[in-house]
Amino acid sequence: MAKVAVLMADGFEEVEALGVVDILRRAEVDVDTVSIKEEQVVISSRNIPVRADKTLTDMDYYDMIVIPGGAGAWTLRDDDRIISLIKKYDHEERYIAAICAGPMALGKAGVITNKKVTS
């Protein structure tokens, strides 16, 4: 069964992160929300506290990562750990999805050069 990690930083857009989780879980895909902070509680763009399933340091193997938009996308883009993770997934030809502002991190990681990207 495929495993998907939805990365979340403070300011994440609720519908872009949790909508993905909802749809994939309904399809019986194994999905974890992952806080990039040391603590599991992440504050959404509308100030809703959401308890992530894991933190970045607790991440297991995933077939795919999802990078949601919202103000949290800038935090993801500026986090060297996330950039390294994106580069690793690209190098290993695993799936990477990014929504709305999320592709900024892909651009910074240099994984979308000469590729067709839709957001």
Predicted regions and their residues:
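Extended, subdomain-level signal for the structured scaffold at the beginning of enzyme domains
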Residues: M1-E92, I96, M104-N114
